[in-house]
Amino acid sequence: MLRDLFVKKKKYAAIPSEQVRKDVPDGVMTKCPKCKKIMYTKEVLKNLKVCVNCGYHHPMNAWERLDSILDEGSFREYDKEMVSLNPLEFPDYEEKLESDRKKTELNEAVVTGEGTIDDMLVVVAVMDSRFRMGSMGSVVGEKIARAVEKAYDLQVPFIIFTASGGARMQEGILSLMQMAKTSVALKKHSNAGGLFISVMTHPTTGGVSASFASLGDYNLAEPGALIGFAGRRVIEQTVREKLPEDFQTAEFLLEHGQLDAVVHRDDMRESLRKILEVHQGGEMAVWQS
């Protein structure tokens, strides 16, 4: 139109999106998925990967978790050399395993070993959701069972941090049988008076939640963790009802008696220390032959 000729247009400097991305190197900033606040990654790491604005607990890898709860330099790893094979010849499974090994620098989805918390010896297992979404295959189950047996032999408590999508479909029944294997090992440990502390982190689902994750003498969880067996949509379609908004969260499970406590990451080491201290010399520490 003619009037557009007499209207002074605003001038804008066009900045290519690629140029913007280059100005901020990858990994320098972290965006909270809950409150959407953008902050320096170093601040998030300094705060144990908890959002300083809303308290959202970002996922931790296995080594970060171990560093946050164990005495410095006390950890000794078990069964590091164990790796999964492809007994069912599932297509592309070996390639995916190798890709995850390179990406995570782990051989499997769980790290096991022994260490101390305030000089109290424990055997610990930490699942890492970066490796095949923390799914439980034959090696994951075997490493956890061996760790429990080591706790039995040493007559010390066993602690596990779970983060898993459930059983690993590429291993079929070999994966499902790990539910029984780990549960039997924990039963032996319990019958001997052994203490087992399970800490469920986001997410703990499927066969893991239906087996060893829920068998603790103390069942703890981090705030906001998703904990359940089947997915929300599957359950709603099955029962034909709308589920509560907070269904399958750690807080929901605590309210309904399925957890003993929801523990903030800042308080996790101290909470574990107190539990261990209470059971030193008590009934749970009386081992039977």
From Swiss-Prot:
Keywords: ATP-binding, Cytoplasm, Fatty acid biosynthesis, Fatty acid metabolism, Lipid biosynthesis, Lipid metabolism, Metal-binding, Nucleotide-binding, Transferase, Zinc, Zinc-finger. Its EC number is 2.1.3.15. It is found in: Cytoplasm. Binds 1 zinc ion per subunit. Signal peptide: none annotated. It catalyses: N(6)-carboxybiotinyl-L-lysyl-[protein] + acetyl-CoA = N(6)-biotinyl-L-lysyl-[protein] + malonyl-CoA. Pathway: Lipid metabolism; malonyl-CoA biosynthesis; malonyl-CoA from acetyl-CoA: step 1/1. GO terms for cellular component: acetyl-CoA carboxylase complex. Its cofactor is Zn(2+). Residues 28-289 form the CoA carboxyltransferase N-terminal domain. One of its GO terms (biological process) is malonyl-CoA biosynthetic process. Zn(2+) binds at C32, C35, C51, C54. It comes from the Bacteria. Pfam families: Carboxyl_trans (PF01039), Zn_ribbon_ACC (PF17848). InterPro entries: AcCoA_carboxyl_beta (IPR034733), Acetyl_CoA_COase_Trfase_b_su (IPR000438), ClpP/crotonase-like_dom_sf (IPR029045), COA_CT_N (IPR011762), Znf-ACC (IPR041010). GO terms for molecular function: acetyl-CoA carboxylase activity; ATP binding; carboxyl- or carbamoyltransferase activity; zinc ion binding. Belongs to the AccD/PCCB family. Acetyl-CoA carboxylase is a heterohexamer composed of biotin carboxyl carrier protein (AccB), biotin carboxylase (AccC) and two subunits each of ACCase subunit alpha (AccA) and ACCase subunit beta (AccD). Component of the acetyl coenzyme A carboxylase (ACC) complex. Biotin carboxylase (BC) catalyzes the carboxylation of biotin on its carrier protein (BCCP) and then the CO(2) group is transferred by the transcarboxylase to acetyl-CoA to form malonyl-CoA. This is Acetyl-coenzyme A carboxylase carboxyl transferase subunit beta. The gene is accD.
